[in-house]
Amino acid sequence: MAAQGFLLIASFLLILLVLAKPLGSGLARLIAAVPLPGVAGVERILWRTLGITDHEMNWRQYLLALLTLNLLGLGILFCLLFWQEWLPLNPQRLPGLSWDLALNTAVSFVTNTNWQAYSGESTLSYFSQMAGLTVQNFLSAATGIAVVFALIRAFTRQNVHTLGNAWQDLVRITLWILFPVALIIALFFIQQGVPQNLSAYQPITTLEGAKQLLPMGPVASQEAIKMLGTNGGGFFNANSSHPFENPTALTNLAQMLAIFLIPAALCFAFGEAAGDRRQGRALLWAMSFIFVVCVAVVMWAEVQGNPHLLAAGADSSVNMEGKEARFGVLASSLFAVVTTAASCGAVNAMHDSFTALGGMVPMWLMQIGEVVFGGVGSGLYGMLLFVLLAVFIAGLMIGRTPEYLGKKIDVREMKMTALAILVTPMLVLLGSALAMMTDAGRSAMLNPGPHGFSEVLYAVSSAANNNGSAFAGLSANSPFWNCLLAFCMFVGRFGVIIPVMAIAGSLVSKKVQPASQGTLATHGALFIGLLIGTVLLVGALTFIPALALGPVAEHFSLP
């Protein structure tokens, strides 16, 4: 089993790096505002048609453009969901959503969280899925990438005040990166058996003679961008454990690769844009190290399983509960770590059924800020926040003003960095405390004891860090939970983006200082270790007490 796990991890990472490297080169061209080959003429027509100028924006204008787009999308999506019954492509005549569920779902998909307090096949029409959720899957992913584009330009430019044109970046990211790659993935899914139609649900008779209604819909097109954009919201309630979303071992591998593809490519793009590819590789090494360790821990925990299974007469203690037999323990464990290391949230197994330690690792990966590869764009700018914190700590130790890529890191940057890093832990801890203190919060818990608390902690962690996966066991479709999690999702997304853009605006105006003998090298093994230690230290200090009350207590309660 150990050899199989090692081969699975190694082959996954090898294929990922082979695919991510060329995509990173394309992203680097977009960061430099250089059109991809053959599209310059098309872009000129698009800019004239859409009324987009070449005028570059400062950080406030860039941020305002992104916020305007996302708030407009939030309002439109809320209306689509609330008045769903009056809109076309609703063959099952599904009613509109309640105001609190519509708000929660709209915020969820606009913020790239894709938390779902509903069952897709029994709640949403095809129009809501296509014109509402799928559109936001593209736009939320493009928003995250645009933010990291602006931050990278802040490091590579000097003595200016502009970070690019947000509208041009959004169009280029959507048309030349997200759409073509998603199209290729969708066609592959269709070839593997994922439905793509607008047919009404199909009544069938099973082999046992029972009647069943099979849901249909444009699944493949939404599934592709769901994974590529690290969105994660399933067309069906069972998400990627549903055979119509994830029918084969090949689609399972393709989905995991799609989740990490753009986050890994952005590391390569960062190195190219910075003029030193070692900088991007250093971040990739740090992410990969944490990722491999986490996968190994989850695989070990799930293979060791639960001793209660043997006592109940099972043939093995290996924890197959909540997992698809066609994927098995190892592939399910790898998928769980991939989807929570990135801010995706898609699942091919029920995380609530993992062992205590096996479920704690995905929860902790979310709590450290989704920086181990992370979401498209958000993962890299989140890790760069920890880079700034790491160089600040190193500067304190050696008595020098901290700097990164030749840019001095001053008080303003550190204030914004601290603010951005503290946003999600505050949301998680205060939100979980509020839920446990109120009757409305506790009434949704279906399990008592440490596991029940773990379900609450996981839900708030998932929302605040824009992941979207769930432990289940929590009746979250209530006004209290819909509003609480919507608030956590919105602030967890834009409460980080705003200080990140402020950091970009401050850095872009600074001069690049030449390296000296006292300059800390930020591409070697020493800095990689310092960066990993910073991430682990912040995560440990912040969440160990809460984790001790949940999964740790549950683990030690086993015989």
Curated annotation (Swiss-Prot):
Keyword Nucleotide-binding: no
InterPro entries reported for this sequence: KdpA
GO CC terms, sorted: plasma membrane
Disulfide links within the chain: none
Record PANTHER family: POTASSIUM-TRANSPORTING ATPASE A CHAIN, POTASSIUM-TRANSPORTING ATPASE POTASSIUM-BINDING SUBUNIT
Similarity comment: Belongs to the KdpA family.
Summary of subunit composition and partner proteins: The system is composed of three essential subunits: KdpA, KdpB and KdpC.
Protein's UniProt name: Potassium-transporting ATPase potassium-binding subunit
Source organism (scientific name): Salmonella typhi
High-level lineage: Bacteria, Pseudomonadati, Pseudomonadota, Gammaproteobacteria, Enterobacterales
Gene: kdpA
